[in-house]
Amino acid sequence: MQTGSTLHDDRTSVSALGGLGARARGASGRLLPEIWMQNGAKRVEQALARLLCAEDHGETELMAAMRYATLHGGKRTRALLCLAAGALADTPAHILDDVGAAIEMMHACTLVHDDLPAMDDDVLRRGLPTVHVKFGEATAILVGDALQAHAFLTLASLDAPGDNRIALVRELAQAVSAEGAAGGQAMDLSLVGKHVELDRIVAMHRMKCGALVRASVRMGALCAIAEDAADATLYCALDHYSACFGLALQVVDDILDATADTATLGKTPGKDAAAQKPTCASIMGLQAARQFALDLLCEAGEAIAPLGPRAERLAQMLQRASAYLFKHAPSA
């Protein structure tokens, strides 16, 4: 993979992202991005609290641990991507909220399992003790299993046509399959202590992180626009956008693991180096990895530019990611 010949400088990157957001804001007059994101995250959290209500399921230790894993922080990036893609059409908010909640349940499942001693062996997540530390390993395994099941139950119970529900279930299942997050985690574990090419790391990141990001975007669109009924360019643009966005998120995570403190990360820093895990940051160097992430965010913006103002929320998600990178991983 060549990166050096295509790098933009920071000024170009910010200009490209800012231009997209500025056009979208000027065209819509809708909620400011920060307010929309806060409201969207709150709606999804309310849906999670409702779907994992102790009164409905009983306040068992398992249910308490499931709520702990899902309701205590997080940027809700994947759910917001779902809501942003849902804004491409007039998708009912209550459907998007539940789909976003299902995605967050699945994301929490992957985090709970990734944190286990047999996997990444981490004791902090979102600034709190990980589920296996607080509730024990056996409960943590069951939490991941149950959250996965509840995610699919949520999608199967949506107030939506059967074909839509099937498409959503298939999309989420594919994202965490052996070709998605599970396969990516297996590849991650297999690369520990090895010298590998950048392409291998990129392929692993696209599976481990990128597959669920891609599903989040596609599921938001699928709520209202069936793929076979959409303009041929729509899902192609969304797939390109999400592939770049998902990889950029993981590259940023690689950088912050090497540079940020516990308060910023919400988890133990320096874990990748301590475990001898190859990452984009360790292979490329911090500054090249940072520029790589910015280039990916710009490429994602270019992918959705033809969609015009209706993609404003997706463009604003890119701006948020770029701002986070500039804040927590400034250039040398």
UniProtKB/Swiss-Prot annotation:
Coiled-coil zones: none
Principal subcellular localization: cytoplasm
Subcellular location as annotated: Cytoplasm
GO cellular component: cytoplasm
An example molecular function term from Gene Ontology annotations: (2E,6E)-farnesyl diphosphate synthase activity
Residues reported in the UniProt entry to bind isopentenyl diphosphate: 75, 78, 107, 126
Protein name from the UniProt record: Probable farnesyl diphosphate synthase
Organism from which the protein derives: Sinorhizobium fredii (strain NBRC 101917 / NGR234)
